[in-house]
Amino acid sequence: ILDNVESRGLGDVYKIQIDVFGSRSRAYVQVQNGCDHRCTFCIIPYGRGNSRSVPAGVIVDQIKRLVDKGFNEVVLTGVDLTSWGADLPSAPKLGDLVMRILKLVPDLSRLRISSIDSIEVDENLMQAIATEKRLMPHLHLSLQHGDDLILKRMKRRHLRKDAIAFCEEARKVRPEITFGADIIAGFPTETEEHFQNSVNLIKECELTWLHIFPYSPREGTPAAKMPQVNGNQIKKRAAVLRDLGKKQVKSHLSSQLGKNHNILMENAYMGRTEQFTEVKFDKQQVEGSIVLGKITDANEKQLFATAI
């Protein structure tokens, strides 16, 4: 298989394809590398080149091997994951890959997809989100900002309304879904009004897991040549977003009290729900197993559970 992959110019993707978390609990499978887009703040395309996809058959074979070795969960990763397939024959979409994995690897208990560009989500992927219970109800979105002018200057392909519409639609078809997101604070030319639109977007989309990045110029990128925001102001805005993120997490955790979850054990006492929420058990469990647990309590960072 490796020879076939390298003959397609995909050896670089294949060689870093699998990362293991814990002992037989979760495996990360890189199915795509590089990026065809040129966001004005990003240096990745200059270092990793254009988008390259691992063929679906290779991915399925690898996941079958992981399942045979005892892994209960696989996470599909990539630099620009939703662009997967564009460079392959017939240009399949990420949704096609997800459906194929779930069909051909019936013993895979849980499949996750990592950071995605919501504007590129295809019909089959949305269908999988709605109907495939083995596809976990947790999506991390590459949103970056909540203001249309800043999004344009970032050279993003979505508008604020697109992000809101996607979250509303996904929540409509999968009510238990949670969202994470990347948000940049202090992008060049960002005013207080622009910043408030990011704050409001987090609330309107009901984002839970936030990755906040204070803007830092990357040499050679268009954004580095734009008028910069004062460094102290960037830090203050990033702090505001992080504080909001803590409140969003606390709200989510509180909403889970009394509920039952299937929890994948990362070690003897700690695991993750379907929504990737961290859970600590009162008694030791089998690492790598999936345990049905009742949520009994929560603090600011995690849930607590008893096995049922």
Indicate residue ranges for each PLM-predicted region.
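Single conserved hydrophobic/aromatic residue that forms the stacking wall/gate
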Residues: I1-Y14
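Canonical Radical SAM [4Fe-4S] cluster-binding loop centered on the CxxxCxxC motif
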Residues: F21-G57
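Conserved, mostly hydrophobic/aromatic
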Residues: C39, I59, L76, I113, ...
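Conserved alpha-helical substructure of the radical SAM core
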Residues: R48-V75
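Conserved SAM/AdoMet-binding glycine-rich loop
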Residues: D68-E192
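Radical SAM enzyme [4Fe-4S]-AdoMet core and its adjacent flexible, acidic
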Residues: G85-L104, M154, R160, P214-K247
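Terminal RNA-binding accessory module
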Residues: K225-I308
